[in-house]
Design a protein with these regions (language model features):
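Conserved beta-strand-loop-alpha-helix hinge in the C-terminal portion
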Residues: 228-272, 521-584
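The feature captures the beta-strand-to-loop junction immediately N-terminal to the Walker
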Residues: 49-51, 339-341
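Conserved ABC ATPase "signature" region
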Residues: 126-143, 423-441
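ABC ATPase C-loop
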Residues: 165-166, 462-463
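Helix-to-loop junction immediately C-terminal to a conserved catalytic motif
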Residues: 64, 354
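Conserved ABC ATPase signature
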Residues: 148-152, 156, 445-449, 453
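Transmembrane alpha-helix interface motif
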Residues: 585-628, 632-637, 751-849
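Catalytic Walker B motif of ABC-type/P-loop ATPase nucleotide-binding domains
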Residues: 173-177, 470-474
């Protein structure tokens, strides 16, 4: 990729050294790492491996200088970057984490990329040169700097996080599983972006990744960490038959030749490792993993003759349809893989099939033998308890599912809710925990597990309920090879016990190993999909199942042609992958928000707009009469009309204010202080001349105070306001920008709240009373908010936020003559209204004259 901007200086590659280094978190008994020794030369590209729990992420956080100090844990030995303690050398390292959402700090692309440079005090002119340069390197140079980060795909967000790090010129690039949350396209995007970075900057790189093959062409050295002795894992084989520290160090060929078996046992995806083709069922009998390889008798026994779940002319989405006229049938004894790019709508389709989101049009139906007594065949119409054991959903975010205080209770919850005894439910839970290597965590709180362990727990808790239709959103995310293999086995067992398993996944090895039928969910403008069976926008009722008699066949059954005649159609899976066409993500972006409905207000500095709202309110608080409120309100309407906002637009934009003002009028008119003539008296209701006057005064005062404040706030950009508060009002940047980042997190928490409600419905807990349900969800949301805040704080700290150096600014906030006019208006209008009321004798008069 050719750069188009002048280089502002290439960062020098950093040298890294560890001398008998170790770290123990304050809340843990055992050391996360111990006796770590290595030297990394400038420009080296290192792959950091180790079993789950070996402390890879802890080491990466330490190198980024965000691990904490003496209050956060106990440190041994030394860890340095260019000879300086890693905590003091934070400006020399840049950390990119797993989750793109947890690293996006500001709303606009350019602001987010510039955030780290501002934290380091880089001069303003150089900031934008660095931003353009870094966005160019990662392939985002064609995206407008003012574009909202909410409209980026997962791969684009991760590349933006990488660009924000590159703009800091760190010298040491730290990548902690940066592709774990991405689809194959996103993985390629990030990989290629990193390759561009290394070719142009020659920075030192350390990357942590389970899937070694992703980075194999970019690395020249492999370092393997072992677990400290006290952290042994009793649940299975791992690479911890060592005292910790570095157990292997060399070129990729040397390490994989010498340590391949140990790494594989520890869970790494070693190149050349064979994917299993068989598994042992609950009786210990060897069975094929791929459905196409099953014995015909087994096939006949486990496969349902009729579909268990049908999408009939389905339109799905959240408010606006993402896909329309979708027709699919899912059979028992089969595995289906909903595949496609990030953001296409796979999870939304899965939630709709699970009966958790209502169809926008059409129907989702289940087979007759699954319908609860007296109910329709639409799972969305069922109660939460009726869903349990029939249709189950494993959510993309495991923490959305947690509803108990221990790992064991989490798995036992489903069986208990289905009426099984405590003893039987606990037996099922213990068996499931043993299968997934979670036995030692049985008494632990689910929130204390690692990301991969949480994913296994979320799958185990739903498998324990043995639903007839099991829908799983990214079931193998974050798994090493050992736990991935066990997850593969559990899915195969569920399938061969007659369940229809529907997976949202990007995991090609998983799909291949299970012989799953692919259903592509892809944007309507994507011409690269190899499929002839378009199941959206058509009238066909297409059911897809794997053929038992062919290694690569998929039967399309119960099809109807355009004339409605039934046909039995058989097509090859390789050529006839069903395709659900959805609205392209680029077409779902929100229209650009105007800075204000008023041309005059749009020209004002955000701080001026904020201050005007306050200044216009304060004098009116000292008045409660019809005249002052009427004068102020009349002048405000005239000024808004001159500024380009007609009265009808004002009313439309501020309708909640009018409702509030009307409510105040009614309550005061009916129950206000009585004086003057009485018009109606009935019980507590007493409408008098005085109460009506006060009601009118309150109605007008509410409008006079609130209408201009709302118009001034409409379209106000939070980032521009934050810049103004720091630069013009001189509020502490740490307070202002921390609050700004928190505002963005609030949007994510709204999504979390909705997901928690859907999850509790899926787990049989959605029939509780509204108050009890809200309390339970509020606790879960509190935990999620703390965890999100922690991740966000880490991302901000990794970008230099809160450091000792003075902060610079990328966007200058200035006041102009028009702002002076705004301040004059804000003072003159309410003061003039008060003067008129005082001179006419109406100021705060309780009765009409």
């Amino acid at each position: 990729m050719t750069g188009t901007h002048t280089t502002t200086g290439t960062p020098s590659a950093a040298a890294v050294s560890a001398r008998d280094w170790g770290w123990r978190h304050t809340t843990r008994r055992d050391f996360a790492l111990r006796h770590v020794n290595f030297d990394i030369q400038p420009g080296e590209r290192v792959l950091l491996l180790g079993a789950s729990g070996a402390g890879k992420s802890t080491l990466m956080a330490a190198l980024a200088g965000v691990l904490g100090g003496a209050d956060d844990g106990e440190e041994e030995g030394s860890l340095t970057i260019d000879g300086v303690d890693a905590r003091q050398a934070r400006v020399r390292s840049g950390l990119v984490l797993q989750d793109p959402d947890s690293q996006i700090i500001l709303e606009r692309v350019g602001d987010d990329a510039a955030f780290g440079c501002e934290s380091l005090g880089v001069p303003r002119d150089e900031i934008w040169q660095r931003v353009h340069e870094s966005l160019d390197i990662v392939g985002l140079d064609d995206i407008a700097l003012d574009r909202s980060t909410q409209h980026l795909s997962g791969g684009q967000r991760q590349r933006l996080a990488l660009a924000g790090v590159l703009a800091m010129h760190p010298g040491l690039l730290l990548l902690d599983e940066p592709t774990a949350n991405l689809d194959p396209t996103g993985v390629r995007e990030v990989h290629d972006a990193v390759r561009q970075v290394l070719e142009r900057t020659h920075e030192t790189m350390i990357v942590v990744e389970h899937h070694i093959d992703v980075w194999l062409d970019l690395i020249d050295r492999v370092i393997v960490l072992g677990k400290p002795e006290s952290s042994g894992d009793s649940d299975g084989v791992s690479a911890d038959d060592h005292t910790g520290g570095v157990i292997a160090d060399g070129t990729p060929d040397e390490v994989f030749a010498a340590m391949g078996d140990v790494l594989a046992a520890g869970g790494a995806w070693v190149p050349g490792r064979r994917i299993p083709t068989t598994y042992r069922d609950a009786d210990g009998v060897l069975q094929p993993l791929a459905a196409r390889d099953r014995d015909p008798q087994v096939q006949a026994r486990v496969c349902s003759p009729e579909p268990l779940l049908i999408a009939d002319d389905l339109s799905f989405g959240r408010g606006k349809p993402l896909g329309e006229h979708v027709n699919l049938s899912f059979y028992g004894g089969e595995v289906y893989a909903l595949m496609g790019p990030n953001g296409a709508g796979k999870s939304t389709l899965a939630l709709t099939l699970a009966g958790l989101l209502p169809p926008l049009a059409g129907h989702v139906r289940v087979s007759a033998d699954m319908v609860p007594d007296g109910r329709s065949d639409d799972p969305h119409a069922w109660t939460s308890r009726e869903l349990l054991g029939r249709v189950g959903m494993v959510f993309q975010e495991p923490e959305h599912q947690f509803a108990t205080g221990s790992v064991r209770a989490e798995v036992a919850l489903g069986p208990k809710s289905m009426g099984k005894s405590d003893e039987e439910a606990n037996r099922i839970a213990d068996d499931m925990l043993a299968r997934l290597g979670l036995t030692r965590f049985a008494p632990a709180n689910p929130y204390t597990l690692s990301g991969g362990e949480k994913r296994r727990l979320s799958v185990a808790s739903m498998l324990a309920a043995a639903p007839r239709v099991l829908i799983m959103d990214e079931p193998t995310f974050g798994q090493d090879f050992a736990t991935w293999t066990e997850m593969l086995r559990l899915i195969a067992i569920a399938r061969d016990e007659g369940s229809a398993v529907i997976m949202v996944t990007h995991d090609e090895p998983l799909v291949e190993a299970l012989g799953a039928c692919r259903v592509m969910v892809t944007p309507a403008n994507d011409s690269d999909v190899n499929g002839i069976s378009n199941v959206s926008g058509a009238r066909d009722d297409i059911g897809v199942r794997l053929g038992a008699d062919s290694a690569s066949a998929a039967d399309v059954v119960n099809a109807a042609d355009a004339d409605g005649a039934a046909n039995d159609v058989t097509v090859r899976a390789a050529a006839a992958t069903p395709v659900v066409r959805v609205t392209p993500p680029s077409d779902r972006t929100e229209t650009e928000r105007p800075a204000s409905p008023s041309w005059f207000v749009a020209k004002l500095n955000p701080v001026t707009r904020f201050a005007m709202g306050l200044l216009m309110c304060i004098p009116m608080f000292f008045s409660l009469d019809v005249v002052s409120a009427s004068v102020a309100l009349g002048i405000e309407f005239i000024l808004l009309w001159i500024g380009g906002v007609d009265p009808l637009t004002v009313a439309r934009k501020t309708w909640p204010v009018w409702i509030g003002a009307a409510g105040a009028f009614i309550s005061i008119a009916l129950y206000g202080q009585a004086s003057g003539a009485t018009y109606l008296h009935f019980g507590a209701i007493n409408i008098t001349q005085g109460s009506l006057y006060l009601a009118c005064a309150m109605f007008l005062r509410v409008l006079a105070i609130a209408l201009p404040s709302v118009i001034l706030a409409l379209g106000l950009d939070p980032t521009d306001l934050a810049d103004g508060l720091v630069q013009l009002v001189h509020l502490p940047s740490r307070f202002v920008y921390g609050g700004l980042a928190g505002m963005r997190m609030f949007t994510l928490l709204q999504d979390d709240w909705r997901a928690l409600g859907l999850s509790r419905r899926s787990r049989g807990l959605g029939d509780e009373g509204a108050v009890r349900r809200a309390i339970a969800q509020a606790f879960s949301l509190l935990v999620l908010s703390i965890r999100r805040a922690t991740k966000l704080a880490t991302a901000m700290e990794a970008r230099g936020f809160g450091g000792d150096q003075p902060r610079s600014v990328a966007r200058v906030s200035k006041l102009h003559p028009v702002d002076g006019l705004g301040y004059v208006i804000a003072v003159v209008v309410p003061v003039f209204a008060l003067i008129v009321a005082i001179t006419t004798g109406f100021w705060n008069q309780p009765l009409l004259s």
